[in-house]
Amino acid sequence: MRKPIVVVGSINLDLVATADHVPLPGETITGRDFNTFNGGKGANQAVGVGRLGYPVSMVGKVGEDSFGAALKNGLRKAGVDVKAVQAVKGSSGVALINIGSDGQNNIVVVPGANGKMLPKDIARHAVLLRKAGMLLAQLEIPLITLETLGVFAHRHGIPLMLDPAPARELPAGLMQVITWITPNESETRILCGLDTQEPVTPATAARCADLLLARGPKNVLIKMGAQGVFLAAADGVRQMVPAFPVKAVDSTAAGDAFNAGFAVSLLSGKKPHEAAHYASAAAAISVTRKGAQPSMPSAREVAAFLKAQK
């Protein structure tokens, strides 16, 4: 029996405006379209895992508002176990997303109920968490709760994959209990102290991966958009895994699709570079579709995509 993936993280409603380009600071532009989608990095990754047919549970919170029930139901429909998703007083989390015609985006997240994920919630769901084959987490819930989760994972020998988004510095204690850390380019710049405009090349990624490994994580995956992914694994592997060339429509959930695909493939027995290849396919499919959770591919779609590349 496969041990489930358990995602501890955010559940949001995404409010998405599309325009010819992402507005610059102080700029007001006319948009072309507006949609709402279920989102939140935690929920996105849980849905990504569920769509790939792997057992997955979500630990998180929604508000007692008009969004909460719909957010929970969206998870359930994707095959996610939602017994550990709690409704609390106040608003659900929301994300305000602007998307340009090139697929690039900027995002403002208002935590809402996600801000009420507390350290005691880790203890409350300890039985579920102990059953996990891997724990997936992000930075859209309080940092102190993530530190508690990290200690729990380390104590029980459960691999912890951390997606360090939204970008910020991380405490040493948390870094030392991470099994996989998966920053994108902007997060890599912050974690490695690079200039905000410095391009993240394969050489830069290799240097940053070594810096991150020295701080405690056992493995590093640096997500570099169209360039691909730089992998620095505990088994000594250091390599670029190229991305698949596709026309991007919406890159909002590309990183979430990647993390979901990587976790599923790794727990299915693949080696890290093989799992990164599979995850890159999942991410490539996701950017060709609008919306966060709606963009997550099924296992059949990923298999067909990979077959078409041969």
Regions found by a protein language model. Give the residues of each.
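Conserved phosphate-binding/catalytic loop of the ribokinase/pfkB sugar-kinase fold
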Residues: 87, 97-134, 139
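Glycine-rich phosphate/adenosyl-contacting loop at the front of the ribokinase-like
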Residues: 1-61, 66-70, 77, 247-249
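Conserved beta-alpha-beta core of the PfkB/ribokinase-like small-molecule kinase fold
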Residues: 134-207, 227-229
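A glycine-rich helix N-cap at a beta->alpha junction
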Residues: 74-89
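Conserved phosphate-binding/catalytic region of the ribokinase-like
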Residues: 1-3, 168-173, 199-310
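Short gly/ser/thr-rich secondary-structure transition/capping motifs
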Residues: 79, 115-120, 160-167
